[in-house]
Amino acid sequence: MKEKTKRKLRTFVCLLMIPVFLTGCRIKTTPLGVFAQILEYASASGSSSSQSSHHGTYHSEPASTPQPQIDYDSLGDIGTVQTIMIYMVGSDLESSYGNASLDMDEMEAAGVDTAHNNVIVYAGGASQWQDRGLDGDACTTLLLTEDGFAPLDTYPAENMGDPLTLSSFMNYCFDFFPADSYSLLLWDHGGGPVLGYGVDENYRDLLTLDELSEALADSVGAHMTKLEWIGFDACLMSSLEVASVLAPYADYMIASQETEPGWGWNYAFLSVLSDRAIPGDEMGEYIVDSYMDYGEYVFDYYPNLYSDLTLSCIDLNAYAEAEDALNTYFAELDTSLDVQNYPKLVRNRAKVRDFGSYSSDMNYGMVDVLHMLELLGDNSDTAKAATRAVESCIAYSDTNMENAGGISICYPYQTDEDYRDACIEMQEYLGFAPNYTRFLQDFYAIQNGDTLLADREISNAHTTVTTENDGTYDESDITLQLTPEQQANFASGGYYILCKAKEEGYITSEEDPRADEMYLFIQGSKRVTLDENGVLHAAYKNNALYMEDDDGVSDIPMILTESDISDVENRYLSFVVLMNFDNWESQAAKLQIAVNEDYPDGIIRNAIPLSDDDDVQSASKQLIRLDDYANMSVAARCSYVTRDENGDLLDFFDWETSKWMMGFEVDLTSDYRTVVQ
């Protein structure tokens, strides 16, 4: 660290243009690589009594229905108004963090009217339980009583990623806990409609949408009834594809478009249960409001645990009309799709609100349906009709995000090709909006282009610099004039900022003879626009973000990627390693940092743990308190300028890497903060 001084980096800007129909596509993608492993969970489950398929693990014999081992008379009257079934897949959320146990504590503290309502939890899927006295090698059914949870039965662990396990639990509840209405709550990780819900830690399995459909058909469908609501206390599950699966079996869906923080739902909502059956839309409003209120309460006390929040109650009885209207709109859009209008379509797609990519390690391709229709629809009659139909099925929703209307759809863009194909396969299997699926197929058929790089130093690029009225930072508009052909083919772009390691004093020629060729990555962004004159604009604030603690300001900037485009702030990700010296525990994490009018020097919103488990790609619900750690390390490797055989500059990420790592440490026990210089 050093004394704080005003400084400017000597930087180098690379502008990237992505045209759209040249051969040899080299568009950057979000690494996925493990999707095939997810589809092959069945073969890795280690269960000798199961049969494998890419749809999951199925028992060769139906799962046995657990029989209660409790004196019902000792519990008082069994409620007849409402039965809420909670399928709690503990996963690492319980084994590592105890979140399932904490939520069960919340349920007990809610003061549920157990005389008229049944709340039954099926708990399993975790390698160990932090509390509650539950066994990681077993599954347990518990009934909420006025004295807390009472175990009904414990038996050897079933695979909670098996649809038979879920249907068996629900049939058990139908048989032993009859009521006027039933609801189902699915608790755990979520991965959106492509990956599905729940991660059984013991069997390495999850429930895909086709498996969820199978489980509901074999339980709700078999009993010729309909659930009042189905809720996901899980990430990324408020989507039209999920709604299509649930619509035959429930009146309402309650779920989040975005990832959820580790604390998940606020189970104080159970206190509203009474001697009347509460309609699903009314209960949905209770659940949404309690979730949002608790989140704001947490953020007031722990600003470094800030998260984007969304929660919606979807009217599944209005779903069919929404799908039909959307299907009609995309039939029209697909007819007009060609290589001439494709670039404009891609530019608009890049602006649509994405979910999950800012708060996880993946690009899930989940976009807000209403925002998508606004940007892609060109104000057409079919787009307006689709918008009205989608709005009509959103019974209630709330959020602290921009452009989060309540329900999403999977529209992969710049994702792994396997993930993209899996999205289409999923939609085809479900019979979901076939014209939309056909549009995606045609969209990807055109998406065969080559990446054209235009690299220019700031000093040579056309730059305008103005000073804000408060004088806190400078604004640079870095521009690049495109040729007519480039303009016609331009789809999307990005830029990254490099600094010269030697000129910044990070390295000397004595330490490395190639020091003059060495650059350090500082910042990357997709905040690039094309104006009506064919000029590409990259808005770069002519400064960088540093860390400051009691020892001063860091020698090098934070390494930032702007992965979420917001109209009200700049949002960055930065990879760090956290350390506790007492037990030498370390945790790789991703900081979410925001710079806005309220925080011109930036603020660390939260820290998300990075999993070392390559098999599991569901979105992380857990957040890290930086105050629980003593030290934070930031490091990046320098690279040498590298050109191809024709002398053309390669993409920075294809440059030759050096042996030199540049970095710094931050004392988290001190008064640390971010600063912009």
Model regions: which residues?
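N-terminal extension/subdomain marker
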Residues: L39-P178
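Terminal, contiguous helix-loop blocks that mediate binding/assembly
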Residues: A44-D77, P193, Y197-F232, M237-Q677
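Catalytic-core segments of thiol-dependent peptidases
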Residues: A123-M224, A234-L236, L240, Q257-E258
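Structural recognition of the beta-strand scaffold that forms the well-ordered cores
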Residues: T83-M88, N118-A123, Y182-L186, E228-F232, ...
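Bacterial signal peptide processing site
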Residues: R26-K28
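Bacterial N-terminal signal peptides that target proteins for export
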Residues: K2-V13
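C-terminal motif of bacterial Sec signal peptides marking the signal peptidase cleavage site
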Residues: F21-G24
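Composition-driven recognition of long, low-complexity, acid-poor segments enriched in small hydrophobic
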Residues: T5, P31, F35-I38, A42
